[in-house]
UniProtKB/Swiss-Prot annotation:
The keyword Cell inner membrane applies. It comes from Salmonella typhimurium (strain LT2 / SGSC1412 / ATCC 700720). Its EC number is 7.4.2.6. Induction: Part of the opp operon, which is constitutively expressed. PROSITE patterns: ABC_TRANSPORTER_1, ABC_TRANSPORTER_2. The gene is oppD. SMART domains: AAA. Part of the ABC transporter complex OppABCDF involved in the uptake of oligopeptides, including the cell wall murein tripeptide L-alanyl-gamma-D-glutamyl-meso-diaminopimelate. Responsible for energy coupling to the transport system. Plays an important nutritional role and is involved in the recycling of cell wall peptides. Binds ATP. This is Oligopeptide transport ATP-binding protein OppD.
Amino acid sequence: MSLSETATQAPQPANVLLEVNDLRVTFATPDGDVTAVNDLNFTLRAGETLGIVGESGSGKSQTAFALMGLLATNGRIGGSATFNGREILNLPERELNTLRAEQISMIFQDPMTSLNPYMRVGEQLMEVLMLHKGMSKAEAFEESVRMLDAVKMPEARKRMKMYPHEFSGGMRQRVMIAMALLCRPKLLIADEPTTALDVTVQAQIMTLLNELKREFNTAIIMITHDLGVVAGICDKVLVMYAGRTMEYGKARDVFYQPVHPYSIGLLNAVPRLDSEGAEMLTIPGNPPNLLRLPKGCPFQPRCPHAMEICNNAPPLEAFSPGRLRACFKPVEELL
């Protein structure tokens, strides 16, 4: 089945769908406040994909949880996030539930823990449509089958009667993608959607998301540590470290001409098929403890280009159209 058979009209690509300004996420802990996301800024248009990249603890997932209103109870949000012209941070719970169901959806990292093991997959899909679209049970069943077909689930009608444990990891992730798209959201947030999958299934899921993006004109935020995933699907890339933006720009620019030592380190750590026998490169050290961040640039203790001026926090500045970075090292010395 063609995805276009189930697609509905979406905003024109020229329109800014999501605008995030100075997003800040802080958690109160017994040891003090931890700032997980520090003054994050980006925009996303309909049909675009933004990749948010970084090591564990960089603030990627907390950015997504803040936008979805899913922070832990000790979390606090600052800044602004405007979706379709509407401020969505700190919305009342009822409005937030409606927004999450009908406008913004999320694919979580582990589909096995996101699906109810005691309910048939079909029942879980149908529940979304009956609750949020007011469909009858028969209508919800047929629409769920159509969406499973759309995500290329083999024998979709038969699979409706199966339980999550009867599916492979890749098939469970297809179920989660189908569920996320049932209400035709304008924004899809995918949090490490291929981490637990083998490389063949990863490629299939990435191809599927690309097709869905084109057919539904859905904007996607792809949260990942895998730069190969970013290269395959993203239009823009935001590189995060210790809750801050290190580099931001078009995906092809960041890949072929990275201009921040952290971005360069991440790319150098990706295994290459044309470097047989070459040493596997890594970034020395570990991400910082957010309770005890180093003075100045948070990447300074691990940076091969660290200078005395790095004891001051580098501002995030534009150095060419559409590109930002936070680093004192001259651009030409990193290219």
